[in-house]
């Protein structure tokens, strides 16, 4: 009886110590203020592709992404900073196995590299996003499945590709579009101001932001669009030319096709 009591006390002490470590990690980074859904334009990102591999969606030929794809759903602070790697939670792909078709289509890796994990190793693109950002999304999310499922649903509900297409902004290696017009199209569709990130004059990412209850809100980085720190006054949505040289036009899908 005494030995059993000692064992129970030992287990309790170990559990308490582990819980204390987790609490301390969470306390070191305060709770986030809002979410940023970051979307990548493959025509810009894939232009830097020099090597192909099976996991790189830029190398899928006619099956390569033809619309904005998900980079991540990021907990952010109102001061422009963000938490990261809030607690240790090793990524387990089997937890999201039922979401794999949607993830491969809408949240693919656009690189052959293996991103670093919060634990010092290398892993998958999805694993990186969960460990760096998903672990900081508490108290909204506590598990991988709901984090990835909600991100997919937000992406499908806020179809930026279709919004731009309807406004006349289509993929082109020759056309330049007014940054203000692109921002206005998104404002009219979702009643918020996005953040736009460019590589030189090409749109690289567009970010749509949400309160913790997933109601849309302005992004912090959108508050000074007139400075155009990242993007010039006129921007492009480049087409992607695969490595084999065969031009592949990134066609804008309709809302029905995106679903």
UniProtKB/Swiss-Prot annotation:
Residues reported in the UniProt entry to bind RNA: 40, 71, 125, 128-129, 132-133
InterPro entries named among the record's database cross-references: Ribonuclease_T2_eukaryotic (IPR033697), RNase_T2-like (IPR001568), RNase_T2-like_sf (IPR036430), RNase_T2_His_AS_1 (IPR018188), RNase_T2_His_AS_2 (IPR033130)
Signal peptide: 1-19
Keywords tagged on the record: Disulfide bond, Endonuclease, Hydrolase, Lyase, Nuclease, Signal, Stress response
GO molecular function: ribonuclease T2 activity; RNA binding; RNA endonuclease activity
Any one Gene Ontology BP term: negative regulation of autophagy
Active site: 71, 129, 133
Induction (UniProt): By phosphate starvation.
Disulfide bridge partners, by residue number: 46-58, 86-136, 198-231, 209-219
GO cellular component: endoplasmic reticulum; ER body; plant-type vacuole; vacuole
Entry-linked Gene3D superfamilies: Ribonuclease T2-like (3.90.730.10)
The enzyme's E.C. designation: 4.6.1.19
Reported tissue expression: Most highly expressed in flowers, but also expressed in roots, stems, and leaves.
Leading EC class: lyase
Reaction it catalyzes: a ribonucleotidyl-ribonucleotide-RNA + H2O = a 3'-end 3'-phospho-ribonucleotide-RNA + a 5'-end dephospho-ribonucleoside-RNA + H(+)
SUPFAM superfamilies: Ribonuclease Rh-like
Family: Belongs to the RNase T2 family.
Function noted in UniProt: May remobilize phosphate, particularly when cells senesce or when phosphate becomes limiting.
Protein name stated in the entry: Ribonuclease 2
Gene expressing this chain: RNS2
